[in-house]
Amino acid sequence: MADGTHSTHRNPSTAQLIELALSRGEGELTANGALVAKTGERTGRSPNDRFIVKEPGSEADIDWGTVNKPFEQTVFTALWNRVESYLGDKELFVSDLEVGADPEHYQPVRVTTETAWHQLFARNLFIVPEQFNAADKPIWQIMNAPGFECIPERDGTHSDATVIINFAERKVLLAGLKYAGEMKKSMFSVQNFLLPAKGVLPMHCSANVGIKGDTTLFFGLSGTGKTTLSADPKRFLIGDDEHGWAPGGVFNIEGGCYAKCIDLSQKNEPVIWNAIRFGTVLENVTMDENRVPDYTDSTLTENSRAAYPLEHIELRKEENLGAEPHAVVFLTCDVSGVLPPVSILTKEQAAYHFLSGYTAKVGSTEMGSSSAIQSTFSTCFGAPFFPRPAGVYAELLMKRIESFGSQVYLVNTGWTGGPHGIGKRFDIPTTRAIVDAIVNDDLKGVETEHLAKLNLNVPLAIPGVETKLLNPVNTWEDKAKYAEYAQQLAESFTENFAKYQVPDSIKNAGPNA
């Protein structure tokens, strides 16, 4: 990249980047030492602005549609050159990082940013290796220019901003976007395309490990509890959002955490609270007059975030790796108040619910989404990030579960006693007690009750959980109303699942509409 008049900061330290971000007016320092940055009107991902370059090497393997939208190679080249030229006379920040904490499955990536704070984010969220690219793999390039304004008529984009992935050239272009989450999710999408070809399942999940070396995975959309539940003071964290499951073990795709901050409290989330300090980027968080962050304030967005390196977490797996999981938890946030707090799934039910990805958008991470909580089906609990057809990932999950014998659970972190607005949301201590029972193997072989309409098996008792909560009908005053809502939910599952071509054993593992 041309750089005639200004310096380029290569592999800058955390302190250097914070110093530069402050001197350049990119952010402010909080009382707890974190750097606060604002992202303007885009406070979440922009799915309508995300594209994949259509080229012969990957075209046949991508599930083209509203999520994976095609972009012309020649138009991409022109835009990349235009952005490169725009950055040519600017002070730049460049780091050599890696994505994937596995010596075989990592991808080397050179990240170039226009701002110091985006570079700090990249160094917090990606892996800063002791030796860059030890296996001498071809290097990916990320070019991040938030100050560049796209012109759709000229650049072929949807708006004034864009995210474009080019598999053939190993390039990711981010232009006109300040929201830093786009950077991490673009490389997640890259790994989600590359890993299945090697027999590795990429997952939108968090992971932690117990003292005995037992790994647990938590799948779920943003706001359903992935980060909160994996940040367990009694267990060692592997990572909070993106992992690969290979034969023999699980590895983190990242080197940091990107935790939601809305209503963050020291009491309920001590691990995250303590991780927010010097070196952390707080995105769209407001402060009081004493520079103390106000995590209750959603003026800027419900999607306020903290980006910090894994080193900020005391109890963690330093090598970012774990054994294959003995327990897999699908986190669903049920706004209808129909699903039980926990169900024990068969292998076929696991495939059904993995493909369905039923949950809710909570404090949505996407631009243009209403702030209201709404139910959604998100394939693999992360539809926006998976370039291949859903069946590829479901098949890999089934293989991994079968070969290792992992037990899968469906845990509802949403509502009970009625839908959102009438019922109440399961509190964090209740969900934690359920997760404790799962990781301690207390639910293996327990007596269960079958909920026919939902086709789910629920335990009759769990230590530390009020028994009344376990069968959701018991928490509804109006039982007929519950039956009505359960029927509606079963129908929506069936309707959504009709698009999948899968064996009957999986098709019949869902609710009975």
From Swiss-Prot:
Reported function: Involved in the gluconeogenesis. Catalyzes the conversion of oxaloacetate (OAA) to phosphoenolpyruvate (PEP) through direct phosphoryl transfer between the nucleoside triphosphate and OAA.
Q: Which GO terms describe its biological process?
A: gluconeogenesis
What does the record give under GO molecular function?
A: ATP binding; metal ion binding; phosphoenolpyruvate carboxykinase (ATP) activity
Protein's recorded name = Phosphoenolpyruvate carboxykinase (ATP)
Question: Which parts of the sequence bind Mn(2+)?
Answer: 185, 204, 241
Q: List the Gene3D superfamilies.
A: 3.90.228.20, Phosphoenolpyruvate Carboxykinase, domain 1 (3.40.449.10), Phosphoenolpyruvate Carboxykinase, domain 2 (2.170.8.10)
Share what the entry says about its subunit structure, partners included.
Monomer.
Which parts of the sequence bind substrate? 45, 179, 185, 305
Pathway field of the UniProt record reads: Carbohydrate biosynthesis; gluconeogenesis
Q: Name one Pfam family in it.
A: PEPCK_ATP
Annotated source species: Shewanella sediminis (strain HAW-EB3)
Q: Which reaction does it catalyse?
A: oxaloacetate + ATP = phosphoenolpyruvate + ADP + CO2
Similarity comment: Belongs to the phosphoenolpyruvate carboxykinase (ATP) family.
Q: Where does ATP bind?
A: 185, 204, 220-228, 269, 305, 431
Q: Return the broad EC class.
A: lyase
UniProt keyword terms in alphabetical order: ATP-binding, Cytoplasm, Decarboxylase, Gluconeogenesis, Lyase, Manganese, Metal-binding, Nucleotide-binding
Q: Any idea of its EC number?
A: 4.1.1.49
Q: Which cofactor does it need?
A: Mn(2+)
Cellular compartments annotated: Cytoplasm
UniProt remark on cofactor binding = Binds 1 Mn(2+) ion per subunit.
GO CC terms in record? cytosol
